[in-house]
Amino acid sequence: IEANDRYTACPFSNLVIGTDRPLAAQEFGLDGLKAAGVDVTIAKAIGVDPDTQSVTLEDGSRVSSDRLILSPGVDMRWNALEGYTQAAAEILPHAWKAGPQTALLRNKLVALEDGSPVVMTVPPAPYRCPPGPYERASMIAHYLKTNKPRSKLIVLDAKDQFSKMALFQEAWAEHYPDHLEWRGAIDDGAVARVDAALDAVYTDFDEITAPVINVIPPQKAGAIADAAGVTDLPGWCPIDPLTFESTLQAKIHVIGDATIAAPMPKSAFSANLQAKVCAFAVARLLSDLEPTPTTLANTCYSYTTPDEAISIAGVYTNEGGALASVSGAGGVSPLATDKSIRNAEAAQAVHWFDTITAEAFG
């Protein structure tokens, strides 16, 4: 059951914002799933009965199941950042769901007068794709350096540490010293409120106005997770990492960014692997077999220029009903390395994207 007949992928969407990559390269149809024998229903799910694992569709019809797997994605927590509403997002785009918001942010950059500032705000964790804001900052800085050389991006961050921080800062110092300024919480980077009518953001001690403001707001699990009763008070979904079954509702499984699966990050790689582990577990449960413990992994590629990328990887096991990082496994790209390594990782990112989308959509 999918609300849209075409899917717009978030991975690589930052390149749409900052390079000449077309938005169409992010779009995928569902015909491949149908050809593989999957019964695809294009409809919006608006309700879930957790007692029967049945789903109510927007037209009022219901779909029953023995076990239900939810992939809720994320929704923005409107007004968690004062002043940031759905209406405000049409002026200060978040672009944290790929599609029209991606195009809106790109178009605002294109229309920017050279010399005018750009602002990005980054929320506290957790949120979808931990290194995503910093890849986006890199791509926006690249766009400004190439097309609006008198403009600069100011990143206002609610944190003082972030994923692949040393690697990003090394790249920024090399490529964008005049086009990117990052301010952490200790430097008054945490944004307290925004005003879309004034194109303004406010920290504890500063007011900054800019014609282009990219607000990445606090997030939560998508609305269908609330309807199913699988969210906790912070708005995310606790799960059993052996099966990804909700710990709040029996026979309902949750995968992807909506889950509480730390230290496994909210990433596309994680979601894809969680889906496979969950499907395997559900198949065994439906056959009255015990689920088999598995090892999970994650890799996140991030572009720092259109042809250079960095990565972080992790491996995770189930220990006492919670995921734990495997000591000595995974790692990050090396600092101060040859450009050919960064080029190779950029090529690997393309291969990963092509593989994961082929797996998902055929």
What are these regions (language model features)?
Residues 235-253, 305-324:
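FAD-binding beta-loop-beta segment adjacent to the flavin cofactor pocket
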Residues 311-362:
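C-terminal auxiliary extensions adjacent to catalytic cores
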Residues 6, 73-76, 219-221:
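Short glycine-rich anion-binding loops that position phosphate/pyrophosphate groups of nucleotides
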Residues 256-304, 313:
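A conserved FAD-binding loop/helix module that cradles the flavin
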Residues 36-56, 63, 141-235, 290-291:
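A Rossmann-like FAD-binding core segment of flavoenzymes
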Residues 40-135, 142-146, 214:
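FAD-binding core/adjacent interface of flavoenzyme oxidoreductases
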Residues 1-39, 124-165:
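Beta1-alpha1 glycine-rich phosphate/pyrophosphate-binding loop at the start
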Residues 85-114, 208-273, 284:
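FAD-site-proximal beta/loop scaffold in flavoenzymes
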